[in-house]
Amino acid sequence: MQKVFIALTDHKRLDEFLAKELQISKNQVLNLIKEGLVFCQKKEVKKGGLALKEGDEITLLTPKITPKPLKKELDLEIEVIFEDEDLLVLNKPPNLVVHKALSVKEPTLVDWLEFKNYELSNLGLKERYGIVHRLDKDTSGGIVIAKNNFTHVHLSEQLKTKMMGRYYIALLSTPLKEEKMSVECYLTRNPNNRLKMIALKAVKKEKSRYSKSEFISLLTSQNNLNLIGAKLFTGRTHQIRAHLEYLNRHIIGDNLYGLNGALPKEEIRIMLHAYLIEFKHPRSEQKLRFKVPLLKDMLEYLKKVFDKENLDEVLDEEKILHAFIAK
């Protein structure tokens, strides 16, 4: 597949021209150029600063995804919560990295999407095709995938303007101090452990990023385990886990941010799940909300901790949303 554009005037830079035509940033145009997807007069473009002449034909290729052999463990079933021509909403299982990085050797969610022959947006680097937002490797739950660049741009803008609602469920080893709490701070890499993020209590420092989360208490067990809801206003690396550590609270099963004495004796993954996601459909502008069911392992663990009737009641999506709105 390809798109063709015609330059109507002389001397305009190619990156500026495509940024305007595609409604994306110049950096995103440069990523397309690096991937070898942009041609001018049938010649591959190497630099974004290429000066266009009136009548120049600019071609943008959409790469055809070819299935490739994958490790056996990647040939798994991932629940599709919603799908149309523009996007996917998936229920990501735990122990699956979303996209490749230098430190990532195992197959990723992007590999799985390509294996399943899904059309994906290609504004970012190849290893991030389709990815609008991320979930940590061990976190399960809802993730939105863009099938085309139009969708990617509009969903990214909703994230940037905080119009996309993302709500999580987590199980804490100790109850929150208050029924409703918020953390607003800057996050940066922990100098003592580069795998972790750390909240800065005061001013912004170099290489730190603004972050905000809100937490509500949903249910407390007889042995003081606390089921909570978490709302993201920003989406930084390990944000919920780092913010809870800032409050001296820890998620059951979190081997990175958790306290050793608070971890269960049996092996269990982190009890953190992206439960609700809200956004406006980029094309129809219809408001959409998806409840992403807890996966079996987490649900079974919660049933051991809480009475099923009480658990079902507090997991009602309307009650969770209302609790965040209420003062």
Swiss-Prot record:
GO:BP terms for this protein?
A: enzyme-directed rRNA pseudouridine synthesis
Disulfide cross-links: none
The signal peptide stretch is none
**Recorded superkingdom:** Bacteria
This entry's Enzyme Commission designation comes to 5.4.99.-
| Keyword set includes RNA-binding | yes
Pfam families linked? PseudoU_synth_2, S4
Mind listing the GO molecular function terms for this protein?
pseudouridine synthase activity; RNA binding; rRNA pseudouridine synthase activity
- Catalysed reactions listed for this entry: a uridine in RNA = a pseudouridine in RNA
Does the keyword RNA-binding feature in the UniProt annotation? yes
Q: Which residues form the S4 RNA-binding domain?
A: 12-79
UniProtKB keywords:
Isomerase, RNA-binding
Residues in the active site?
Answer: D136
Report TM segments: none
Q: What family does this belong to? A: Belongs to the pseudouridine synthase RluA family.
Q: Which NCBIfam families match?
A: rluA_subfam
The name this protein goes by in its record: Uncharacterized RNA pseudouridine synthase HP_0745
Protein's organism: Helicobacter pylori (strain ATCC 700392 / 26695) (Campylobacter pylori)
